[in-house]
Amino acid sequence: GQEALVEEFVEGREVYVGVMGNNRLQCLPAREMVWGREVPVQARFASYRVKWDEDYRKRWGIRNRFLPPLAKSAQRRLEVTCKEIYRHLQLNGYARIDLRLTADNEFVFIEANPNPMLARDEDFALSARKAGLEYPKLIERIISLAA
């Protein structure tokens, strides 16, 4: 037989946090994926179709938006968690940390993306803009962090 990796499904909201920096880290405003139509909870995960198939996204009312404001303690916990993950994985320059926010307000780490999509209209760039970093400056900053 073949070995398989089986993981527990974590129910909750899909949250994406961009992190920039090498020594001094900055968390960008968080984004989340929301579903406009009722879908079984177990089917709510970011598959290829969910992320990239525009017809599928329209059919199910899937969109990404900024995470509504959290309580200050939860926001602080989110940022500390993302920075700890970034450092633990020895990431540098920029990355995106994907988590689930459970009904108990716990953040569960799903994965780190060390090379997230940087298109102007994608989550990372939109979060940078909300943080006051316009697209040309974002690209300049990423290049300077790589130097």
Regions found by a protein language model. Give the residues of each.
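Phosphate-binding site of ATP-dependent enzymes
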Residues: 1-73, 77-80, 108
